[in-house]
């Protein structure tokens, strides 16, 4: 069972792209994507503080994580994490379905 549970919100197509991602980051949100398996990729938004708290544990990178998107739960593993070069805060995360 997953030790980490993150709450996410699905992003509409008009909330995707460079400008929209910058606006999300200013609101302390992190854009992310969930892909893999037989399902279509899903663009989501995570809370920065919630993601940073999970990243404090090295186990987060090795175990399956549950992401709740609305009423659906996705079991995923982190595939890639992009950080700000100076601040070291997460800028974008890629999750692959487990």
Curated annotation (Swiss-Prot):
GO terms for cellular component: cytosolic large ribosomal subunit. Pfam families: Ribosomal_L25p. It comes from the Bacteria. SUPFAM superfamilies: Ribosomal protein L25-like. CDD domains: Ribosomal_L25_TL5_CTC. Residues 1-23 are annotated as: Disordered. Belongs to the bacterial ribosomal protein bL25 family. This is one of the proteins that binds to the 5S RNA in the ribosome where it forms part of the central protuberance. This is Large ribosomal subunit protein bL25. It comes from Acinetobacter baumannii (strain AB0057). The gene is rplY.
């Amino acid at each position: 069972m997953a030790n980490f549970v993150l709450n996410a919100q699905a992003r509409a197509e008009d909330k995707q792209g460079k400008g929209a991602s910058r606006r999300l980051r200013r609101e302390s949100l992190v854009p992310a994507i969930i892909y893999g398996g037989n399902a279509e990729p899903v663009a989501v938004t995570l809370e920065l503080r919630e993601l940073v708290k999970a990243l404090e544990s090295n186990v987060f990178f090795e175990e399956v994580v549950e992401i709740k998107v609305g009423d659906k739960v996705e079991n995923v593993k982190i595939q890639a994490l992009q950080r700000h070069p100076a601040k070291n805060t997460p800028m974008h995360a890629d999750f692959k379905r487990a």
